[in-house]
């Protein structure tokens, strides 16, 4: 099992949780970004810097993810591709993407994109909170416990 992180937009507090989990469980945590990002020295934590460009990091993750892996991303199309390959995907707020909910998420994303392109201001996501951090940590622990059996 490996943890794949869509690292460009992942909050630092979530990266820290992932680093601790990788060390504790001795599993690989791979951060993929199109710019250099700092990581702690560890044999369990790696970074992959890909070229800049639309969906380059996402495509790298999809091309390399295996069925037993877990991907952390807020990118709904990436999560959809990961699920198609049979791997798990969660967002930094702890929400598990599933075959059952990903189509609805994609539809809502596309709808909001259409609203924004027509000039309607839709606002952004809510501020990342302590509650979000806790939800992520709880979901991660649950999924890792299931996968490590």
UniProtKB/Swiss-Prot annotation:
Bridged cysteine pairs (disulfide): none
Entry similarity comment: Belongs to the UPF0178 family.
Biological source species: Marinomonas sp. (strain MWYL1)
InterPro entries: UPF0178
Protein name: UPF0178 protein Mmwyl1_2258
């Amino acid at each position: 099992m490996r943890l794949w992180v869509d690292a460009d937009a992942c909050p630092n507090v979530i990266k820290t949780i992932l680093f601790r989990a990788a060390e504790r469980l001795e599993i690989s945590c791979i951060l993929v970004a199109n710019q250099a990002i700092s990581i702690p020295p560890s044999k369990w934590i790696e970074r992959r810097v890909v070229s800049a460009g639309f969906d380059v990091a996402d495509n790298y993750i999809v091309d390399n993810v295996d069925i037993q892996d877990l991907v952390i991303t807020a990118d709904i199309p990436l999560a959809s591709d990961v699920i198609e390959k049979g791997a798990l995907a969660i967002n930094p707020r702890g929400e598990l993407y599933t075959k059952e909910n990903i189509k609805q998420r994609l539809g809502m994303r596309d709808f909001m994109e259409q609203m924004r392109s027509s000039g309607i201001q839709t606002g952004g996501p809510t501020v990342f909170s302590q509650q979000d951090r806790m939800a992520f940590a709880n979901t991660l622990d649950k999924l890792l416990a299931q996968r490590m059996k």
